[in-house]
């Protein structure tokens, strides 16, 4: 901790876990030597060095000397690991110790606690630690006005059995501790927004989402002057938008569908992502300085270079200067069949055969979508809906086939456009042989 403080990476009073890295020194087992050999070596050393030199060298016994050498090697190995660990802290961003946040008229206080990321996030497949995450990350502890630990209303709830991917975590958390913004891109329904939400759920960070594909205007982001009644007198007062309110807090500001945002809105975001603060010209030139733990997370169907797939209307190329403000790009793809099957099995407890049919159907629909055959991507939300519907209808319909047929039709087929529906039905027929699907409106 003292080393981290000297580097400016840990403020006075900030907490860390007692052990910052798994580098505890092991005590060496005593080395044993055959009694005859031991006596002979001791005699040879003392005879060769002489009594005075032997005493100066601190030699008393060959077993003690060999045990000391063994211990030195263990100490050196542990020291190398600690140096490697501390070097990883060199480029981390400044960390705040504590602060306050206004939430729905109440004041919550937060305390920053440094925790080892490797202990917070496990490999979902093996349940083992991800060794590349052996570094500290700031987490938050929220308290109400009475000092009791509480939950910030904008901190997402954890999703049971959520499947983190090691590569996503390494990139996202590295960007987080270095103070960098992240750009998550991928097809519809891959979990681009869920990734920062579930990271935030673990480290107790609030998430403020802004959907940029709607009718959001510049004033919604920055704020505007409003006329208010002050004791019978009408006065103008500046009302802050989401940007200045979020920037002063430790949080993730998620810019959903950033690649379809309006140009004037994008220029405001570009200015804010520079990290130097936001100048509110509408409020007399007031400068809003960002909290050291404030981060932007963008989600998009593209890498910012326009629609690569030809299926996302409204996606436009982004300004190069804006893209430079997001140095970390994470491609979020659909879960593999194995990952999705494991998730659905743990969540819904459905028979393996049913899970296999659902995930196979989802995979075929996604392939058809990516190849331009349909405009219906079957997302993990859709596979979850099919499982939920199947569990419900299984207790109502006389056969499991009818329950499955109704679940698939309700969750996927009914929302498909008519020019896509026949292809979706063909894929469903191939995956659910005992069911009878139709492309006509039911």
Model-derived segments and spans:
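Surface-exposed polar/charged interaction patches
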Residues: 6, 10, 43, 47-51, ...
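Heptad-repeat positions
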Residues: 1, 7, 34-37, 41-48, ...
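C-terminal engagement/docking regions of AAA+ P-loop ATPases
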Residues: 396-442
């Amino acid at each position: 901790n003292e080393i981290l403080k000297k580097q400016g990476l840990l403020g006075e009073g900030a907490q860390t876990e007692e052990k910052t890295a798994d580098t505890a020194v092991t005590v060496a087992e005593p080395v044993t030597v055959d009694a005859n050999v031991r006596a002979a070596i001791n005699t040879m050393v003392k005879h060769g060095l002489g009594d005075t030199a032997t005493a100066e060298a601190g030699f008393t016994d060959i077993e003690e000397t060999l045990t000391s050498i063994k211990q030195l090697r263990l100490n050196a190995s542990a020291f190398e690991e600690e140096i490697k660990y501390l070097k990883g802290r060199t480029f981390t961003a400044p960390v705040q110790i504590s602060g306050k946040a206004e939430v729905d008229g109440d004041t919550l206080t937060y305390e920053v606690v440094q925790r080892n990321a490797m202990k917070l996030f496990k490999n979902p497949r093996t349940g083992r630690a991800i060794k590349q995450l052996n570094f500290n990350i700031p987490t938050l502890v929220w308290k109400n006005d009475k000092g009791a630990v509480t939950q910030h209303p904008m901190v997402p709830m954890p999703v049971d059995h959520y499947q983190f991917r090691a590569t996503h975590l390494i990139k996202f958390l590295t960007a987080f501790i270095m103070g960098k913004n992240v750009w998550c891109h991928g097809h519809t329904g891959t979990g681009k927004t869920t990734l920062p939400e579930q990271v935030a759920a673990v480290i107790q960070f609030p998430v403020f989402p802004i959907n940029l594909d709607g009718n959001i205007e510049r004033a919604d982001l920055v704020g505007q002057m409003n006329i208010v009644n002050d004791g019978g007198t009408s006065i103008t007062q500046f009302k802050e938008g989401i940007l200045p309110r979020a920037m002063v807090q430790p949080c993730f500001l998620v810019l959903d569908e950033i690649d379809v945002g309006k140009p004037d809105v994008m220029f405001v975001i570009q200015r804010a992502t520079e990290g130097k603060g936001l100048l509110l010209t509408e409020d007399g030139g007031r400068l809003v300085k960002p909290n050291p733990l404030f981060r932007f997370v963008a989600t998009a169907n593209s890498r910012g270079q326009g629609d690569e797939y030809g299926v996302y209307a409204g996606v436009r190329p982004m300004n190069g200067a804006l893209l430079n403000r997001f140095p970390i790009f994470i491609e979020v793809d659909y879960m593999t069949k194995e990952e999705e099957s494991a998730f659905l099995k743990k969540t819904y407890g459905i028979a393996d055969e049913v899970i296999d049919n659902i995930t196979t159907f989802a995979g075929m629909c996604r392939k058809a979508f990516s190849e331009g055959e349909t405009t219906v991507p079957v997302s993990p939300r859709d596979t979850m809906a099919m499982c939920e519907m199947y569990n419900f209808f299984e207790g109502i319909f006389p056969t499991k086939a009818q329950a499955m047929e109704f679940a698939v039709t309700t969750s996927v087929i009914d929302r498909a456009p008519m020019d896509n529906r026949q292809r979706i039905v063909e894929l469903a027929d191939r995956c659910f042989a005992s069911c009878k699907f139709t492309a006509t409106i039911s």
